[in-house]
């Protein structure tokens, strides 16, 4: 498995997608009652605390990533995004889709397809 380190000498070493997925899952966990693993200001919101925890490298990132995938499967057939909660067919389809996405992400992540050095926002190009 890949080493889930996000910052090496101040540079992001994972994809932005992975960082957003992990931070959003950890923020969700904090909002659901999990206790923070790092010192933080009283005024810090859960997304800020989540990013501080990810930066501290004290998390089990694989477990956090798979918790995010499970949450997507859980909510995919429960009335969100226009899907009827009465539809029994929605959940197996969503579960298969997420398993396919999860498999593809693992393959891409392990093959180093995700590379932040090749990605830039239009706003960033004018700053250089």
Swiss-Prot record:
Domain of life: Bacteria
Catalytic activity: RNA(n) + a ribonucleoside 5'-triphosphate = RNA(n+1) + diphosphate
Stated name of the protein: DNA-directed RNA polymerase subunit omega
GO cellular component terms, semicolon-separated: DNA-directed RNA polymerase complex
GO molecular function, one term: DNA-directed RNA polymerase activity
Keyword NAD among UniProt keywords: no
Organism field: Neorickettsia sennetsu (strain ATCC VR-367 / Miyayama)
Top EC category: transferase
Function of the protein: Promotes RNA polymerase assembly. Latches the N- and C-terminal regions of the beta' subunit thereby facilitating its interaction with the beta and alpha subunits.
Family per record: Belongs to the RNA polymerase subunit omega family.
Keyword Cell membrane: no
InterPro entries, per the entry: DNA-dir_RNA_pol_omega, Pol_omega/Rpo6/RPB6, RPB6/omega-like_sf
Keywords assigned by UniProt, alphabetized: DNA-directed RNA polymerase, Nucleotidyltransferase, Transcription, Transferase
């Amino acid at each position: 498995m890949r080493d889930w380190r996000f910052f090496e000498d101040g540079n992001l070493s994972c994809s932005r997608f992975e960082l957003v997925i992990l931070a959003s899952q950890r923020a969700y966990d904090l909002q659901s009652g999990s206790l923070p693993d790092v010192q933080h200001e009283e005024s810090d919101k859960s997304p800020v605390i989540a990013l501080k925890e990810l930066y501290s490298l004290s998390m089990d990132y694989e477990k956090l990533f798979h918790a995010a995938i499970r949450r997507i499967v859980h909510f995919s057939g429960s009335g969100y995004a226009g899907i009827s909660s009465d539809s029994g067919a929605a959940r197996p389809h969503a579960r298969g889709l997420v398993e396919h996405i999860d498999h593809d992400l693992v393959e891409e992540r392990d093959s180093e397809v995700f590379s932040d050095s090749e990605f830039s926002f239009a706003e960033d190009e004018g700053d250089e």
